[in-house]
Amino acid sequence: MSEKLSIEWQNERKSTLSNRSNLTLKIFTMAVIWELDFYSRPILDENQKKYWEVIICESPLTVQRSPDSLFRFSKFCDGTQVNSVWLKEALSEAIAKAPAPPSKIRFFRRQMNNMICKACKETGIDPIPSRYTVALQEWLKARETDFYPNQPGYDSASASTTSVSYPATTPQLLPDALQGQQWAYVNLEAQALDEMPEWEIAFGEAFPLALLDIDPQTSIPGLIIYSSRAVPLAAWMSGIELAYVKATFGTPARLTLESGASDAWILAQLSNPQTQQEGKNFEQAKQNAKGVHFLAIQSDPQSESFAGFWLLQEDH
């Protein structure tokens, strides 16, 4: 993939995206997706053992979805009952209470893979290891600060951050047939993303910025990949559970795409001081936007449609 200097969309480009008429409105998916966590919580029983809890939150899928409309479910579990049978029963209870059952369930904790996968499959739902769990992570953070401390048996000593860190994995090369020809850093005001439902997008996913209290004037950084095989590239990316784009500055310095529970893909080599500085600027812009950024796929810079567009977050 060749390197391209960092650019910013000019006002005309933003206007084209926001005010383009006669677009085909693309509905990414009508399927319901859930995000799930099943793990111990900082609440102790009478034997000083931690309670476990299953937390389920519906994935918002689009920028216009109201956070308050997302289906949520939670249920505590005695530590002696932690197994796939209990989790399956809890899933069945959640499905009975939900407006619609999910087609798949995302989960981010690798150490719970076997139990979660078994319970989901026995319930007839596809389990998907994924770090694209923005709504779930925000609900977990809220419970850590506003809910658990007010519960009987709360143990501040055992409370920990909701984020989970794992050792970095070695990035893989993108399939040869899906290599892009050019790429560019871009920036877009948060409020411009409100128009995303009007853009012509073949594959993608997003979430409401209200989930993260992002100011409408915040500059959201992004990366556009230009490819003559834009649609196949976007279709492939839609199936690997994108997580976030990240510039790393080891040896060698790279621009990588994180996906699934632990996968990473090389988008470009940052092989000179200029591209490395651009990568650092991209990372700083992400930090200023609470980790929010986007990845777009187009056939060429003149295209007015997107083969793919994903709103992403790297949650630290």
Outline where the language-model segments fall.
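Secondary-structure boundary/capping micro-motif
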Residues: 2-316
